[in-house]
Amino acid sequence: MNFIVRHETPADVSDIYQVNHLAFDRDNEAQLVDVLRREKAVILSLVAVLDGQIIGHILFSPVSITNDKFQWQAVGLGPMAVLPEFQNQGIGSALIRSGLDELKKLGHDVVIVLGHPEYYPRFGFKPSKPFGIQWEIDVPEEVFMVAELWENALAGKQIGRAHV
């Protein structure tokens, strides 16, 4: 399959909504993308395109890690969606790898994700708890993960809770 990964354009908005809706079989993630876009809280939004059709989408947005004394910025991955008929064909992996590569080039150092613990470790994600980072609401430890885009990117960072 010969697809390309490129930046989202304004013409892609309705197709991106549809991809997220169909991939998750609900509107929550599609609506989240629209809200983040409307609030200008998007760092990077990429689409996978095959023969002119958007078949996948990934979005990265700012996340604050805070405690009583400190705050620092990370990047949140999600949602990431692939049309059901194109899942398990490497499209999601290509979107994640392209996104992480571009974020690194942009100078970002830490990415967090709330996702499947069997899937995301292949991209360098590890449970966040050993790094002292927790999600703003209680979630199972194994689904909240962090990736360092640079070696030792978390060294010296203050522990805290992640907030969108």
Q: Where are the regions a protein language model picked out?
A:
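Short amphipathic alpha-helix that is part of the acyltransferase structural core
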Residues: 1-32, 39-55, 150-152, 157-161
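Short acidic (Asp/Glu) patches
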Residues: 61, 95-99, 127-131
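Non-DNA-binding regulatory cores of transcription-related proteins
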Residues: 131-147, 151-161
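A conserved beta-turn-beta hairpin within the catalytic core of GNAT-like acetyltransferases
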Residues: 63-76, 87, 106
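Conserved beta-strand in the GNAT
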Residues: 47, 53-64, 74-81
